[in-house]
């Protein structure tokens, strides 16, 4: 039943949130015209009476505000009763004028100075001058009258008059009244704001959790016409849909109303749905509408002008029950063939989803068997423990024979001088069992010459398929009426007699021949056989292809018509003659039985065709063997895919169950192509055989490898029979690649993204969802209920039961390497250094800190970790490179005393370098020991050293000191490879590996895949559907990699296979390091990882030291000149206008970005501790913006007092008087963005912690460690020192180490050119490319250098270095790699060639320096080569 006009209007009022307004309830919608092309909606409304102005304005505002983003809104109002026109007409005057569409500056005059009065049935407008009256001509008056009529008035006559006597009085009265009204509006607005704030505070408190089913608006009956989302293609006034919510969010608008936006799919498509809140009850319901619900929604479909997409505005929302798939079988099956999203670009669900589903269905166990990898094992183990289900750990491996035979039916007969029959068959398909030979051709050769030939067609007894005709060029007319197969085969036997038989990929042809002979009651071929395909692979392993036409072209043998048997045979014969001559000359092969002596050589595993097999670990020892096998496949036997030779599997088969896998397994392939006998031979290798539901094999029918479902059933039944014959269990498996049937599309998108490179794109993908026991029994019902139950339920459980319980792929604790005497060594290093700094008798605070840390470090077995770090740092320092510490290692005083970090975590203190006197400030008097004023030692008068950053040890190893230390070290990027290799020196190559990573499909990449799928399938998908499909494709493994710094150390009492398989990153067999196969995060708690990072700062420091001869460790941390750059650039001899920066920190690490420079401008730090604050504030999340920044601006606190680093919280709270454990718990919770833990806020208030501090803690999402900030600031100050006092040294180092992009022309031409280039980039704003933005940073430093009185010189062909900027007087000479488009390798080649001898000409430079003509032209244009002639000149004298 359709809605009445008034009911439609009430629906509209609900949408615009005015349903409760009584004065609007009598309205109705007379008409709505939608102009699709212009995106304009025109409403026609009717009311009983003219609406009061305030009601009308609110109605108009809400109407436009709600639908204005979808279309341009127009309207007209008609009223039944034209009552109170006089009152309303004057009220509406201002609105009428402003919305009349009249464009004139006199409009404001009409609003402010013209006073209307309704008199004698007309609106008299009294104005105070003739100009205004003249403006109100007939056209203007008619427009104003029409506007009145549009909002519900009848035709109104408007008469302008001039009233000089009363105009001013009336104007004054009007303005007084207007002031009163404005004051009332302000008061009302103020009350509204207070109400909104009160409402916000109430909403900030935890809203009561909604229980029960969601119901908003009217119920939606299941019998309603539920529309499938794919059928929604245009705007609709009202539709009902049902689906699954896959995304939901609630936004709070500026009006304080909430907007619910959620996305629903019914798996035919998806749509975005919106609804505005009307009251707090709505908001409570909004919080209950979350991802995972099934809902029915009724609403209108509208084109969203912002999203450019159809969306739904919801009227009613109703949660509904949705029946998930259930496994109702009494006896449950076990899935033994299951892929996760760790099967590269081939499966979509994480193992946790799959294990969870198996547990929900009551399955006793489930196996994980990804393609060639085990990377899902750690998560599978955790998921199994969580779900209480037995997890079997397996892999779908690529098995290969160690070598493929060259000769068959071996016989000791000479290869030279004999007769050869080279034959080829053309067939109707690939199966010797189900397809037929349609042409058999052969040539008989002797000494390389054809002496006879054989050529016969065979009538197969049925029409040829189009595929066969296209491939073989044989038609029905050619075979119709030919001899039968038996006749031709008998005739051929006479032809080949006692000859050696040859074929290219001969196993295929021999398979058809032998099957045919057996079919007709004759013997199989017994003659010696040679396969030229494997012979060619053995002799010429580096060729890229071995197809017959490829080899013929390579060796100059004619091939008249490929894929016609007689031509292929003759070509094969000539090739065989050449190959056998080569085999004799190179390997001494003279007899047939010698051919296979070399079949495992020349990486023969690469040429064997991989067949799939399932390997499942039966015992813990078997799991380790599985780790070894997968490692071999990735490291030793990788070729296109990881491969496992059968011989290697045989050696490590103990504890492993081997299954025959899918249609790519050799048992199924043999049964399909060669028959029962061949399949029987192969089946003996396996512990169980697999069969799969017919839908899984459907691509075989599509590819014409199997003719139809009947033949497919026959193959499956034969494999079941084969299992019975051999007493090998047959198990029904699902080849699972996703969880639910509707997830098929995600896999399709992944496969589509790989194009023709993936053979799965050649046919429709099969249905490979995770099947229930019921589904599986139904799939195999054609075998009968008893057989189906046996292979689906009984045998799958039998295999699962044979696997030991408790197998674990991950360890339960950390296994650190052993270094004899590590405990004593760390203690000795620490104590020796402490005594050297603080005296023979250590101060109590020093002794206690050392004792506390050493007890924890030694007691928990962490000494070796410290010692490794100490040795690395010591070696780097010895080799001339400083090391910076990252993270929280600077929180450990033992790390400081053992030389791992420069950061001293003790409270700020003085210490005397001569007599070791010390004095500590333990109550927060100073933020850093580097800020202590200069002071002489009271004992000996020596100037004392300030030190100590006041960092608690707990931030490093936890409150109990038992957290595994994570020591991150910043080595110079130049030195990092040396540091990595030093780990191999310390522990041995077999005990050190790079930390492996797994690269998965990211959101943006998935979006690209979906868009490509949309294009390739010629579809138009809504944005919500694209988002859903992208979500389904994210998280899937794409590749592997390595952590840029992580080195994993295997203890010498174990081997790597106790923790993880190994591989090369991204399967790059040329990589220098092997990595762990498992992502390092999954074994982080089991094996020690050292983060040996590469960083520019230590490289920069080394370069500055080399150029200046100054030891960076002697640079003061409180130099006044250096401190000035953080407040302004004047100390550099420039002002802010010259360098376009209000600070002098351009190019200073940590302090050179626009964001941090802005912080410096607001705070003007003058001390080390304040710089620490800046570093912490700039790296944290919600620590500065909206937090500390506001507190400082408001004058509540200073920079020194705000919360800057995470450690500040613990120390601040201790200084306020809280106990250390409470302080630690608060710090840990706040730094992770969890706010103040429940119950601790009262403790803080009891300790008189200020409100601002408590509120600040509540805003923080992430915090930076103070030790990390300390190390960074120390490096920054050292670099800044050179910038202030050794500018050319600084700039030479900066441009050499930190800069990658240059505009050498602008730089060399001087200030004006450089500033113009900078302006060009700045003018682009956000449109500037990343490269341009990086260049701008470099140009800012270049500009600063020029403004300080220095200059750049263009590349000098005689002086320039390959990559280093050279100082010459007050200039820097640019290196060759500053040339646009010239890489470092070419730059080095130029320098090397120049060192050999000077360049004689541009031609000489181009040849010996390998310089392109483009670069030659560039250098010529910029006078770099002005001294060189174009070509070498020959001198006779």
UniProtKB/Swiss-Prot annotation:
SMART domains in the record: EXOIII (SM00479), POLIIIAc (SM00481)
Q: Where in the cell is it found?
A: Cytoplasm
Q: Which residues form the Exonuclease domain?
A: 420-576
Q: Which UniProt keywords apply?
A: Cytoplasm, DNA replication, DNA-directed DNA polymerase, Exonuclease, Hydrolase, Nuclease, Nucleotidyltransferase, Transferase
Q: Which GO terms describe its molecular function?
A: 3'-5' exonuclease activity; DNA binding; DNA-directed DNA polymerase activity
**Enzyme kind, highest EC tier:** transferase
Q: What chemistry does it catalyse, as a reaction equation?
A: DNA(n) + a 2'-deoxyribonucleoside 5'-triphosphate = DNA(n+1) + diphosphate
InterPro entries for the chain: DNA_pol3_alpha_NTPase_dom, DNA_pol3_finger, DNA_PolC-like_N_II, DNA_PolC-type_N_I, DnaE2/DnaE/PolC, DNAPol_HHH, DnaQ, Exonuclease_RNaseT/DNA_pol3
Q: Name one Pfam family in it.
A: DNA_pol3_a_NI
Q: Which NCBIfam families match?
A: dnaq, polC_Gram_pos, PRK00448.1
List the protein's name. DNA polymerase III PolC-type
> Could you tell me which species this protein originates from?
Pediococcus pentosaceus (strain ATCC 25745 / CCUG 21536 / LMG 10740 / 183-1w)
Q: What is the taxonomic lineage of the source species?
A: Bacteria, Bacillati, Bacillota, Bacilli, Lactobacillales
